[in-house]
């Protein structure tokens, strides 16, 4: 079911003059012929409806679809659908003007100049405009015959120097950047080959003016080839209606030229001589045009060859520049890589130097800490120093560094010289002056001094060979309460660790308490 918006009540003409006008218009355009045939067939086949009681004089009509008059892809209300209506009455109104074209669809533009007696109207499609022109041209309106023509397209441009690969769609796409394009056509010859020319029709004049200025000032390229298009205003020709006899002005020149009918000039006459000269002039013009066209064609071919060679040279130059740029970039990348390697080496060296400095700092700090601890805690030899001292003193037996022979641990018997000093090694020691001693106990296998004689003889006298006579012993000393058992003896001169040195071991006061025979000395 068709929409009512696409339907239109159209009047069927019974006038033979109108039918002849439709036939003449149908001979000019196939769409118009189809529309006229549809109107005629519909008028013949449609049953005559009953006349309306309210309007008995209303002419008969039928309903048609307006969309059937549109070509596939055709745009509506374009400049090509615009009609010029001349010889209008001066008192015509806009409503009367619209009512004149209401049977051909809804118009979109209506303009009337009553002073000069003309107007413009734009219909929906080109086919409807052609039908309206064919029907209304010459119609008497208020005793004045109407003159209807297609209006000149003021927004149309001619495009030259087109490439053979340019199509209608590409041409429309290229010029759409200046404004809405209604139609773009590439002109071809009878074989369908592009002639290098075309035309573009815009919807309004400002975009056409903009395209004309931009293409004239710059070089507008449509394809890869640097071949700019030439844009010019389109020359308007009326090749449909031409100049009918009824529009000719009957001047004196008109009547003079129309005195003789069309004829062929007879050879040898005045007419034939000058007619031949006119033909020779036209032939010369034709030859010159052909020569000019030939020169232009050769110049174009030469320019295309030079352009192709220059394009190859330009491409080679671009390739060389790109190669040089890549080489420069590679060299720069290599330099950056070398700089990065140098930086990494420097950073590694700095890290190694920092690590070494930190280790030295740690070692120095450790030594300072050790020295500080030794200074704070006094002379306390560590384990390694004790071991070194023990190795230096030598193993003197299973009892320790000092293995003093006494009554409870007698030394092995033997005659090995005088008894050594208690706790003293005989190496690097000076001799003790005094009377020679008898045979004493032998040295132990460890080389330590073993005193074989008991510290207290049988008579109870205490020998003072080891300790010189000192002040009275302090209280608490184990030797302090032996009254009457000890007789004072003279101290042995020269007894000491070194010959001629002080008595005793030379450490501290000799008058100190001695708590036991095997007590080790303090450090």
Curated annotation (Swiss-Prot):
Region (Sufficient for paraspeckles localization): 124-357
Pfam families (UniProt xref): NOPS (PF08075), RRM_1 (PF00076)
Annotated Polar residues bias: 472-490
N-acetylmethionine: residues carrying this PTM: 1
Outcome following mutation: residue 197 to A: Abolishes RNA-binding activity but not AR-mediated transcription coactivation
Residue segments, region Disordered: 460-523
InterPro entries: NOPS, Nucleotide-bd_a/b_plait_sf, PSP1_RRM1, RBD_domain_sf, RRM_dom
Main location: nucleus
Domain RRM: from-to ranges: 81-153, 155-236
Subcellular location: Nucleus speckle; Nucleus, Nucleolus; Nucleus matrix; Cytoplasm
Region (Sufficient for perinucleolar caps localization and interaction with NONO): 230-357
Keywords from the named record: Acetylation, Activator, Biological rhythms, Coiled coil, Cytoplasm, Immunity, Innate immunity, Methylation, Nucleus, Phosphoprotein, Repeat, Repressor, RNA-binding, Transcription, Transcription regulation
Modified residues (Phosphoserine): 409, 473, 477, 509
Gene Ontology biological-process entries: activation of innate immune response; innate immune response; membraneless organelle assembly; negative regulation of DNA-templated transcription; regulation of circadian rhythm; rhythmic process
Tissues with expression: Isoform 1 is strongly expressed in testis (leptoten spermatocytes, round spematids and Sertoli cells) and moderately in cerebrum, cerebellum, lung, spleen and ovary (at protein level). Isoform 2 is strongly expressed in kidney and moderately in salivary gland (at protein level).
Bias-annotated ranges (Gly residues): 497-514
CDD domains assigned: NOPS_PSPC1 (cd12949), RRM1_PSP1 (cd12586)
Omega-N-methylarginine sites (modified residues): 507
GO function terms (MF aspect): RNA binding
Gene Ontology CC terms: cytoplasm; fibrillar center; nuclear matrix; nuclear speck; nucleoplasm; paraspeckles
Impact reported for residue 199 to A: Abolishes RNA-binding activity but not AR-mediated transcription coactivation
Function: RNA-binding protein required for the formation of nuclear paraspeckles. Binds to poly(A), poly(G) and poly(U) RNA homopolymers. Regulates, cooperatively with NONO and SFPQ, androgen receptor-mediated gene transcription activity in Sertoli cell line. Regulates the circadian clock by repressing the transcriptional activator activity of the CLOCK-BMAL1 heterodimer.
Record note on quaternary structure: Forms heterodimers with NONO; this involves formation of a coiled coil domain by helices from both proteins. Found in a RNP complex with CAT2 transcribed nuclear RNA (CTN-RNA). Interaction with NONO is required for its targeting to paraspeckles and perinucleolar caps. Interacts with SFPQ. Part of the HDP-RNP complex composed of at least HEXIM1, PRKDC, XRCC5, XRCC6, paraspeckle proteins (SFPQ, NONO, PSPC1, RBM14, and MATR3) and NEAT1 RNA. Interacts with ALKBH5 (when acetylated); interaction with acetylated ALKBH5 facilitates recognition of N(6)-methyladenosine (m6A) RNAs.
UniProt similarity note: Belongs to the PSPC family.
Protein name: Paraspeckle component 1
Lineage, uppermost ranks: Eukaryota, Metazoa, Chordata, Craniata, Vertebrata
Gene: Pspc1
């Amino acid at each position: 079911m068709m929409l009512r918006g696409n339907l239109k009540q159209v009047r069927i003409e019974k006038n033979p003059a109108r039918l002849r006008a439709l036939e003449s218009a149908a001979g000019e355009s196939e769409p118009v012929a189809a529309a006229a045939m549809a109107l005629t067939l519909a008028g013949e086949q449609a049953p005559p409806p009953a006349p309306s009681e309210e309007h008995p004089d209303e002419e008969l009509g039928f309903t048609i679809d307006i969309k059937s008059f549109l070509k596939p892809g055709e745009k509506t209300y374009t400049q090509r659908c615009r009609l010029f209506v001349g010889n209008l009455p001066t008192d015509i109104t806009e409503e009367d003007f619209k009512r004149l074209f209401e049977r051909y669809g809804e118009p979109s533009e209506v303009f009337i100049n009553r002073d000069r007696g003309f107007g413009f109207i734009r219909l929906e499609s080109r086919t409807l405009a052609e039908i309206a022109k064919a029907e209304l041209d010459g119609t008497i309106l208020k005793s004045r015959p109407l003159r209807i023509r297609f209006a000149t397209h003021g927004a149309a441009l001619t495009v030259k120097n087109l490439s053979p690969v340019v199509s209608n769609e590409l041409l429309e796409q290229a010029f759409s950047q200046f404004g809405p394009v209604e139609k773009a056509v590439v002109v071809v010859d009878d074989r369908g080959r592009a002639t290098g020319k075309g035309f573009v029709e815009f919807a309004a004049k400002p975009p056409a003016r903009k395209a004309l200025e931009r293409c004239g000032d710059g070089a507008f390229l449509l394809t890869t080839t640097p071949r700019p298009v030439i844009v010019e205003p389109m020359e308007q020709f009326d090749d449909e209606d031409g100049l009918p006899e009824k529009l000719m002005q009957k001047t004196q020149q008109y009547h003079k030229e129309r005195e003789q009918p069309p004829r062929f000039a007879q050879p040898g006459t005045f007419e034939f001589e000058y007619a031949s000269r006119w033909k020779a002039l036209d032939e010369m013009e034709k030859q010159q045009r052909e020569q000019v066209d030939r020169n232009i064609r050769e110049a174009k071919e030469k320019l295309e060859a030079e352009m192709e060679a220059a394009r190859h040279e330009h491409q080679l130059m671009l390739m060389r520049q790109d190669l040089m740029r890549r080489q420069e970039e590679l060299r720069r990348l290599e330099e950056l890589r070398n700089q990065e390697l140098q930086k990494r080496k420097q950073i590694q060296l700095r890290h190694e130097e920092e690590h070494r400095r930190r280790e030295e700092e740690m070692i120095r700090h450790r030594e300072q800490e050790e020295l500080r601890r030794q200074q704070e805690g006094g002379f306390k030899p560590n384990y390694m120093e004790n071991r070194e001292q023990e190795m230096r003193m030598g193993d003197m037996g299973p009892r320790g560094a000092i293995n003093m022979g006494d009554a409870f641990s007698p030394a092995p018997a033997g005659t090995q010289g005088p008894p050594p000093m208690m706790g003293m090694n005989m190496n690097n020691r000076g001799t003790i002056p005094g009377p020679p001693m008898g045979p004493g106990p032998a040295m132990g296998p460890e080389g330590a001094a073993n005193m074989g004689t008991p510290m207290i003889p049988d008579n109870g006298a205490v020998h003072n060979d080891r300790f010189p006579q000192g002040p009275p012993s302090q209280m608490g000393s184990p030797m302090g309460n032996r009254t009457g058992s000890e007789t004072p003896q003279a101290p042995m001169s020269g007894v000491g660790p070194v010959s001629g040195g002080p008595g005793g071991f030379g450490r501290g006061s000799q008058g100190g308490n001695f708590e036991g025979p095997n007590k080790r000395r303090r450090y």
